[in-house]
Amino acid sequence: MVTLELIYGVMTDFYHQAFRLSTSRSPMFAEKKQMFALLARHYGHRVVDIRDYMGWRNHGSVCAAVRRMQGFIDVYPEVQREAMELLNRVDEAAGQTYLEFDSAV
């Protein structure tokens, strides 16, 4: 069973690598909020204060964060379909394809 602490630990690593504090006006806030809710729902936990973990500072950070989230999805394939739909929306909003991420990050 994945614990809330593990989810927070993984997300905190994302935060240090690519996320910044932000408000609900930040780019792709809805998708990021949904991703947290998806993980929490799947593992039976409630993630609170999601807004503190939501910001992406710039486009390069978006690419890095999506790459890291992809790695997390690979570890937990149970959430893959729904999470990939969210990532695709992030991808579209960033104006990039996954093939371009390697050169962008």
Kindly label every feature range from the protein language model:
Residues 5, 34-35, 60-63:
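Non-catalytic, well-ordered alpha-helical scaffold segments
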Residues 11, 51, 78-82:
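Recognition helices and adjacent regulatory flanks at domain boundaries
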Residues 29-45:
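Short, amphipathic alpha-helical "recognition" segments used to contact nucleic acids or chromatin
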